[in-house]
Amino acid sequence: MTAIHPTATRAYLTLPYAYTLAQELSASERQPLHQRKREPLAAAVLAAVHAVGYAVPTVQHWRDLADAANLSETLLGMGVFTEPEAQSLFADAVAAVVDLGRKHGHGQEMRLNAVQLGHLVEFGEAYGQVLEVIPARTFIRAHRATERRLRELLVNSHGSDTHEFIVV
């Protein structure tokens, strides 16, 4: 079992971003990510949801869910989704993913109650749909902004009680 560490080392801050600014600027403003890029992302989230609900979830499943939840949170902040239902769905998914991480950190099984699992199932389906419709440039911009936001939180929130960091 991989341990959850409450803090991240500064080495995390020196890792390269997944996408470069050049990739962001050259990505399509109208077309979504290519199918070969978005399908593995959507499939990983659906596999993680399935593992949480019906199998034995691993740390990698949690990471896939956390990545999707963090990216969705950034997309909400960018104003990509303005519908209250979408905002509620993504907020519920983030809460469920945090709960899974806490449970793992305390040596408990990564399981959710029926309501949380329902939110996570909805989120998994919605995430795949989002990837099919948002332009590639928006996705890459959100991905870069998410990485930047998480790094800033790690640097600026040392000793803060406002954020809980679960790094696995």
Model-derived regions: residue spans:
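Short, flexible domain-boundary/linker segments around small modular repeats
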Residues: 14-56, 85-109, 148, 152, ...
